[in-house]
């Protein structure tokens, strides 16, 4: 029996013992060494050869990832680790650190119970680290910390052990501050990481060594020995004395929870159903004999097998031939192949029980975030993505006969990655693809050309703006075309505290199921409780509140009113861009008793026009997306980089100096950041390391707003002149 077969046999045996399973992720800022750490853990567990580990980047198996040297897709792999004489099955998911791929991180967090946060010892905690920690804690995922690239502190910065300890303490404090800020109330203290108990390890993923206090106590290895070996460059002895995989995986087994432990506190927060029901209990107890429930976290398109859905099994056992329901899509499906991933290789299994990460084929209509179950149940709460699409390109097939394939290719891309939005521009017939940034779209379009072999023409990237208001409107009346239905509304700007709570998922988006609970949260954030009690719907950072009293037949048209509210929010009055931070309050209404006279053709225009008219009376404004830019450069390029940023309407937020290296943190509008990669490369002779992340939306300066509105309207084939109140408000 070969090494691989032995491994598979062991994995099969451990899959049945959930107390011996750890579902974990590795998450970090770009280039902090996450994929190198993953590979060396795999090498240690005997999954790839040690010589290749760290150079091979086994989890970066997409050829684009290898070429760019960044991880784009969240890959997963199962491996076995022995701790205190017992074998454990570790399912590892490697997630991207680049902000344009933040959606993958969000999806991976749903499948795992614990996460290794990797922080570069030289750079410390960076903005993307904060984003990833926030996502993990929001999904009730417990963290441990690995401080990487310690070899650079010894070799390049030549720090003394004392200085290194000070640096580690600062990183640990920063990570704990994030845990304090974002962890669920009952875990703020419990989940803090500490050197003493071994929930912190430090080392070098590239040179394959690590240390933790329990390891040093157990083996007698001293930090000073490690420093000497590093200075001598004796990497082989380093690897043997303090093997990375032993230290890190020991920390994982000891401090991160098994599915049996984790599901007890995660299920009540992630699942919206009744916990006391049979299925609720089966998930709570990770019961392989219960009814099967899994959540899809990723769809991969495989050349041979078609669509492969990977996800987490919460209860029951996934078997080939099983009939299942896709809860969100409301479709039935039959599971075909069942397996697990070992890197790019999918290994077939007869069945995969609760507590494991599974890969299945046959779920053709599933998307990431789908709940799959043996019977119809409540779905898991929607996945929250930290960024939103801010850049759009228009795509056309060069050859008309490729059009059907282009449509199918875009459908599949959007399915693999729900942070991509695809829609057809009805005016021009072009397909519009929106993503989280220039790199995100570049990678996806390359994939489209390569995998599908379609010749496409791509427009210059276009920025997605937002419309909003700055003051409350007077009451506006909206009438249906037949004049039988009237709605009286006001619009108000949403306070930042409430908007941020929605964006952070503290107040969930969607139809409000429990108005009292949401009203209480809104009141805590400063909204009048009596007004907040009428909350009906939250949509893309906007709110619809029903403050009417006893209006007859209103309930019958409420769904239509919500649809009309969504239409008004999807396309604002200024330039038909999405709306943000607007509260729409319905104060009174008259609804016709006969439903023939109150259908969609009557209700939609009435509510839509009323909202747009009210917005025009509330000093409407345009917002644009901003990016945070983090640049590391040698000191002498400081001036050139500052100029590059200020020319792009950017502002310097912070600067730090570390030896010869400067870290500049700036914010700039996305619209001005196109082509930044080329400019910064030539300004610094290619010596800048930089990354970006979404920094929210800011108001466009008035002098630019009119010009931008004109450009957007012209592009959409509308009258270029910005509309006036008269144009939008009908004369009743």
From Swiss-Prot:
Its main location: cytoplasm. It holds the Pfam family EFG_C. GTP binds at residues 28-35, 94-98, 148-151. Changing residue 597 to A: No histidine modification. This is Elongation factor 2. Residues 19-260 form the tr-type G domain. It comes from Pyrococcus horikoshii (strain ATCC 700860 / DSM 12428 / JCM 9974 / NBRC 100139 / OT-3). It is found in: Cytoplasm. Gene3D superfamilies: 3.30.230.10, 3.30.70.240, Elongation Factor G (Translational Gtpase), domain 3, P-loop containing nucleotide triphosphate hydrolases, Translation factors. Belongs to the TRAFAC class translation factor GTPase superfamily. Classic translation factor GTPase family. EF-G/EF-2 subfamily. HAMAP family: EF_G_EF_2_A. Keywords: Cytoplasm, Elongation factor, GTP-binding, Nucleotide-binding, Protein biosynthesis. GO terms for cellular component: cytosol; ribonucleoprotein complex. The modification Diphthamide is found at residue 597. One of its GO terms (molecular function) is GTP binding. The keyword Ribosomal protein does not apply. Catalyzes the GTP-dependent ribosomal translocation step during translation elongation. During this step, the ribosome changes from the pre-translocational (PRE) to the post-translocational (POST) state as the newly formed A-site-bound peptidyl-tRNA and P-site-bound deacylated tRNA move to the P and E sites, respectively. Catalyzes the coordinated movement of the two tRNA molecules, the mRNA and conformational changes in the ribosome. Coiled coil: none annotated.
């Amino acid at each position: 029996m070969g090494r691989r077969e032995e491994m598979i046999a062991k994995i099969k045996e451990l899959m049945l013992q959930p107390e011996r399973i750890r579902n974990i992720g590795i998450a970090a800022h770009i280039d902090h060494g996450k994929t190198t750490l993953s590979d060396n853990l795999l090498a240690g567990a005997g999954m790839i050869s040690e010589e290749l580990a760290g150079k091979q980047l086994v989890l970066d198996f997409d050829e684009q990832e290898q070429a760019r040297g960044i991880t784009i897709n969240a890959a997963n792999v199962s491996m076995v680790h022995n701790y205190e004489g017992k074998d454990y099955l570790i399912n590892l998911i490697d997630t991207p650190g680049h902000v344009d791929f933040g959606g993958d991180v969000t999806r991976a967090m749903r499948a795992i119970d614990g996460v290794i946060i990797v922080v570069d010892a030289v750079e410390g905690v960076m903005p993307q680290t904060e984003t990833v920690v926030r996502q993990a804690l929001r999904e009730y995922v417990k963290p441990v910390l690995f401080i990487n690239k310690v070899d650079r502190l010894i070799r390049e910065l030549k720090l003394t052990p004392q200085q290194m300890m000070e640096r580690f303490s600062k990183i640990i404090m920063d990570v704990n501050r994030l845990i304090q800020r974002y962890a669920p109330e009952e875990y703020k203290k419990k989940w803090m990481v500490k050197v003493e108990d071994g929930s912190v390890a430090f080392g070098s993923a590239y040179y394959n060594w690590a240390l933790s206090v329990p390891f040093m106590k157990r083996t007698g290895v001293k930090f000073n020995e490690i420093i000497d070996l590093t200075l001598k460059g004796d990497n082989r002895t380093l690897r043997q004395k303090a093997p990375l995989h032993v230290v890190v995986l020991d920390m994982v087994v000891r401090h991160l929870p098994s599915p049996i432990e984790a599901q007890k506190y995660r299920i009540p927060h992630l699942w919206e159903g009744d916990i006391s029901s049979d299925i609720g209990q089966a998930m709570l107890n990770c019961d392989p004999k219960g009814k099967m429930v899994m959540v899809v976290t990723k769809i991969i398109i495989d050349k041979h097998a078609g669509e492969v859905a990977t996800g987490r099994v919460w209860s029951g056992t996934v078997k080939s031939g099983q009939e299942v329901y896709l809860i969100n899509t409301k479709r039935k499906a039959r599971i075909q192949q069942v397996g697990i991933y070992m890197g790019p290789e999918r290994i077939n299994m007869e069945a995969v029980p609760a507590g494991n990460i599974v890969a299945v084929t046959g779920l053709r209509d599933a998307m990431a975030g789908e709940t799959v179950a043996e019977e119809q149940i409540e779905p898991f709460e929607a996945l929250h993505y930290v960024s939103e699409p801010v850049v759009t390109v228009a795509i056309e097939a060069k050859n008309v006969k490729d059009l059907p394939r282009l449509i199918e290719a875009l459908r599949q891309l959007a399915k693999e990655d729900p942070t991509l939005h695809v829609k057809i521009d009805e005016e021009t017939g072009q397909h519009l693809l929106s993503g989280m940034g220039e790199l995100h779209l570049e990678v996806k379009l390359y994939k489209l050309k390569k995998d599908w072999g379609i010749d496409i023409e791509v427009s210059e990237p276009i920025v997605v703006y937002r419309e909003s208001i700055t003051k409350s409107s007077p009451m506006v009346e909206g009438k249906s075309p037949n004049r039988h239905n009237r709605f009286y509304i006001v619009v108000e700007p949403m306070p930042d505290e409430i908007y941020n709570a929605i964006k952070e998922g503290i107040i969930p988006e969607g139809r409000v199921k429990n108005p009292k609970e949401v009203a209480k949260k809104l009141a805590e954030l400063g909204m009048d409780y009596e007004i907040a009690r009428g909350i009906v719907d939250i949509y893309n950072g906007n709110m619809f509140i029903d403050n009417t009293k006893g209006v007859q037949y209103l309930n019958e048209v409420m769904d239509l009113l919500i649809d009309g509210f969504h239409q008004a929010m999807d396309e604002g009055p200024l330039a038909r861009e999405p709306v943000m931070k607007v509260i729409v309050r319905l104060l009174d209404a008259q609804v016709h008793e006969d439903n023939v006279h109150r259908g969609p053709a009557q209700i939609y225009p009435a509510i839509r026009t009323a909202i747009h008219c009210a917005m025009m009376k509330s000093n409407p404004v345009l917002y644009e997306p901003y990016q945070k830019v983090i640049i590391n450069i040698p000191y002498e390029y400081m001036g050139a980089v500052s100029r590059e940023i200020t020319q792009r309407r950017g502002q310097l937020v912070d600067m730090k100096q570390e030896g010869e290296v400067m870290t500049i943190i700036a914010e700039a509008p996305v619209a001005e950041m196109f082509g930044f990669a080329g400019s910064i490369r030539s300004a610094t002779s290619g010596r800048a390391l930089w990354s970006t992340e979404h920094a929210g939306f800011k108001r466009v300066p008035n002098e630019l707003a009119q010009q931008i509105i004109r450009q957007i309207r012209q592009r959409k084939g509308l009258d270029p002149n910005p509309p006036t109140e008269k144009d939008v408000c009908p004369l009743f």
